[in-house]
Amino acid sequence: MRVTDFSFELPESLIAHYPMPERSSCRLLSLDGPTGALTHGTFTDLLDKLNPGDLLVFNNTRVIPARLFGRKASGGKIEVLVERMLDDKRILAHIRASKAPKPGAELLLGDDESINATMTARHGALFEVGFNDERSVLDILNSIGHMPLPPYIDRPDEDADRELYQTVYSEKPGAVAAPTAGLHFDEPLLEKLRAKGVEMAFVTLHVGAGTFQPVRVDTIEDHIMHSEYAEVPQDVVDAVLAAKARGNRVIAVGTTSVRSLESAAQAAKNDLIEPFFDDTQIFIYPGFQYKVVDALVTNFHLPESTLIMLVSAFAGYQHTMNAYKAAVEEKYRFFSYGDAMFITYNPQAINERVGE
């Protein structure tokens, strides 16, 4: 399969730079996986699409203010983007500088350069940085960090982004990008879903900066997926198995929930799905056999991204590309702060040939 098979024309005017004033007021494009039929509506239509006993699986990761500015003590300006927190004093990060710092280099971070840190080691494209400070890494980031808005939201972060670029149910700090499908859920909608009898469960996948890395190979099968830490606890496993047993659907909110659930299913030895606490490099593209997820809530993704490949594996390649074409024609808003899709699984997707 060629990466270019997943390309589509997107006018820049359709990239959302700010979210809707109300989280749940965005538009919703529904795609029926088996038939490819499309329905246009608003996000709160989810209430009519979900049945009592269906299980919504959310990702409760919390975005950390992961972007730091500063300079090397020796002079040059640097920009640090945290990939993950290693412990209370150390991070693994991407560093942008005219000349990469060497191990032992002293870094002065924060807009006022008040935080002292040391680059201790290099791991491929990533840098290990230790903070010489009595505070924890998280406290330091909350104090001097900027929200790591995706590169296509081409503006500096604002104070409001600390709340807007965060789901209302976020709980566990560690992500450097929001699980964006979840941004559309507000408390009133969650309350109505609960009142209808929709079940809810929470996985954790700390989204890494790798999620924005372009696929740099021509052939999909050659792509090496970035690694992210995921947790699928026992209560989620129990909820999934119970939903399946009573004939209800498991509905993943976002591609990160999909990747968490399907990673746990892939690693399971005895059951459909078992608890999972580990790094995952799962790469889902057409031909992938889904085991757990029956329906998906997701935003519109970048052309040629691993996420549009994941959706194509779920709904079918042709149905997905047709839906994206319709979304562009109907002027849906794209990417992290944009509109959403509700997609049901297409069991024939696994047999579809792509790019022929």
UniProtKB/Swiss-Prot annotation:
Keyword Transferase: yes
Compartments reported by the entry: Cytoplasm
Leading EC class: transferase
Keywords: Cytoplasm, Queuosine biosynthesis, S-adenosyl-L-methionine, Transferase
GO molecular function: S-adenosylmethionine:tRNA ribosyltransferase-isomerase activity
EC number: 2.4.99.17
One Gene Ontology term, aspect cellular component: cytoplasm
Main location: cytoplasm
InterPro entries: QueA, QueA_dom1, QueA_dom2, QueA_sf
Listed Gene3D superfamilies: QueA-like
GO biological process, one term: queuosine biosynthetic process
Presence of keyword S-adenosyl-L-methionine: yes
Pathway: tRNA modification; tRNA-queuosine biosynthesis
Pfam family, one: Queuosine_synth
Top-level taxon in the UniProt lineage: Bacteria
Reaction equation(s) it catalyzes: 7-aminomethyl-7-carbaguanosine(34) in tRNA + S-adenosyl-L-methionine = epoxyqueuosine(34) in tRNA + adenine + L-methionine + 2 H(+)
Function: Transfers and isomerizes the ribose moiety from AdoMet to the 7-aminomethyl group of 7-deazaguanine (preQ1-tRNA) to give epoxyqueuosine (oQ-tRNA).
Recorded family membership: Belongs to the QueA family.
Oligomer and partners: Monomer.
Protein's UniProt name: S-adenosylmethionine:tRNA ribosyltransferase-isomerase
Species: Escherichia coli O8 (strain IAI1)
Gene name, Swiss-Prot/TrEMBL: queA
